[in-house]
């Protein structure tokens, strides 16, 4: 890249000798120069000058290339106006020259020698210049044009070295291309040509990328499955150990202790005996209920609940009925103290077991006045209700007075 000193010198030179326009086409603000002649050219013309070869035109960039002091001196010695005036002053100059003819002419060779001599600080004269004997090449047919397609063969006859001409042709073909490629190398790259195998390469690359993605996902899935299986196995083993420990503590150890102490058979025998007693009690009670239902007899007093559990006191208040020895109907309206009766004395039709006679509460003696003479009759008959004397009623009332719980028999039925 040009140094600040180089930029300063070139800025001063540009302001002189019509250097602010292109020497070839007249474009404004040229950024390229031909150091050999000290002239300023544009970007397009710089490519054409490169095609001439460095022995005819050495091209440099004003801002992008590094400069030497001798090159700056050549720029001061040359210039657009100086070169044009020098060419027009020569006898062999023709305005219709092509670019190749112009810079291959004797006039151009003389000006090159002048610029190089002045840059070295020497005096130059036309008579003493070695370029006086310059003999330009004489081609049979001149095919050089400003825009020759790349790769077009050149039909020129050379008077110099054949190898040099071959190098010149190769250099010209590399720099002077077609119109669409003339900016190649200056920020504009030509896209590569598509080949037939590009499609296959792109397909294979897509296949490789897809397979890589699949393998990556499969490896991730396998690692996740492995981690899950390991975690599940650890949890299962932990639960199994906990279950085994609980079973050992709650079942096996107590059983072992009982076996050692000899208590396990006692526990088994006690459990079996309890179960048998419960089964026996349930079976006997069920059979007794069935036989009672079909025989029409009342339940035996031996199977009845204790006193205080009569149907008059079925509300369950045992504390109030604990002192009552007789049922309510046995003392209601009776003149004499009640006597003990057989278990079947509650029946209306059964005979009295103690006397061998029918019970006094039978319907056969309903309304009879001889209730007082029947001493062995049951006191809860209907005849006692009608035939009892006032004294009997008073005694019954007096007897029933202390037992307040018996008078409230109807109130305890929760009817």
Swiss-Prot record:
Complexes and interactors: Interacts with ARF1. Interacts with the COPI coat proteins, KDELR1 and TMED2. It is probably a component of the COPI coat protein complex. The interaction with TMED2 inhibits the GAP activity.
Span of domain Arf-GAP: 7-124
Domain of life: Eukaryota
Residues bearing PTM N6-acetyllysine: 231
Alphabetical list of SUPFAM superfamilies matching this protein: ArfGap/RecO-like zinc finger
Summary of the function given for this chain in its UniProt record: GTPase-activating protein (GAP) for the ADP ribosylation factor 1 (ARF1). Involved in membrane trafficking and /or vesicle transport. Promotes hydrolysis of the ARF1-bound GTP and thus, is required for the dissociation of coat proteins from Golgi-derived membranes and vesicles, a prerequisite for vesicle's fusion with target compartment. Probably regulates ARF1-mediated transport via its interaction with the KDELR proteins and TMED2. Overexpression induces the redistribution of the entire Golgi complex to the endoplasmic reticulum, as when ARF1 is deactivated.
Gene3D superfamilies: Arf GTPase activating protein (1.10.220.150)
Mapped zinc finger ranges (C4-type): 22-45
Protein name, entry field: ADP-ribosylation factor GTPase-activating protein 1
Tissues/organs with expression: Widely expressed. Highly expressed in brain and liver.
Residue stretches of biased makeup (Basic and acidic residues): 297-307
GO biological process, one term: regulation of endocytosis
Location of Phosphoserine modifications: 246, 342, 345, 347, 360, 362, 379
Compositional bias annotation for Polar residues: 126-144, 310-329
Notes concerning its domains: The region downstream of Arf-GAP domain is essential to GAP activity in vivo. This region may be required for its targeting to Golgi membranes.
Localization per Swiss-Prot or TrEMBL: Cytoplasm; Golgi apparatus
GO molecular function per UniProt: GTPase activator activity; zinc ion binding
Keywords: Acetylation, Cytoplasm, ER-Golgi transport, Golgi apparatus, GTPase activation, Metal-binding, Phosphoprotein, Protein transport, Transport, Zinc, Zinc-finger
Family annotation (PROSITE patterns): ARFGAP
UniProt modified residues of type Phosphothreonine: 135, 189, 349
